């Protein structure tokens, strides 16, 4: 018989209503589901370094066609903490049948016979989304192409919710030179807009947020603004005057002859420690800074690491619990 804690957890899972669903976009979750997942994660937080035998006998497969540290390890840890087991493929183009030109659809069909849930990362969004339709178990996107990274956004939203107790009314600057390829920035902007935050999207105009993303965001919340081509001084002044949170979704710098040019424009979005300190002293306000990680040299002053404004490492402590909540909400338990 379940003890009271497990009964509470089961009731929360049932209330979320996401059992046997895929998570491909943050928009697959309603606002209510997101907030209920936060509450479930909060309930599971005490076990993120121990173990609950809720999913004993259940298996997670993690298939990563691109490098990952935090996403893959936190999902595998989450499954283990819930009492389940994991099977992992981190170099499929070398060590799996994909190296023999097996289609992703066939691979997903096969792996779904072994697993109760799959976490997939793949560089081609269309190919990945098509492959999901062949799966006989639920699939979670660990990031597909440049479109979205829904579980990273879910983690960062949960971190803000833990910090402020709310999302509604927060003023969040999503900032990077390149918002075309910032998949977490897209997921985060969708969810923040839906949950009632004021969103500023700061980038270079030539790398602005894709039109289809902006169109979808503005259908949700027409209060989202795009800000282009600021200098480093203007960028930090904007943060000082407007931000509760600076959200850095990271970006992949190009290689070759474009690399040096990109480093120079990255410098315009450098978060200065002095800006954070000035807000603290003059406004008695903490402007929080968070980053999806991994970060690149030149994105922020590393003194922020030791300040009260730092949220990116704090988020790691929340990452297992929120992914425990998501996995449990999808698999369910008796």
Put a short name on every predicted segment.
Residues 2-73:
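Positively charged, low-complexity intrinsically disordered leader regions
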Residues 53-161, 296-300:
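Phosphate/diphosphate ligand-binding glycine-rich loop within oxidoreductases
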Residues 218-304:
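Rossmann-like adenosine-cofactor binding region
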Residues 286-287, 292-334:
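Adenosine-phosphate binding glycine-rich loop
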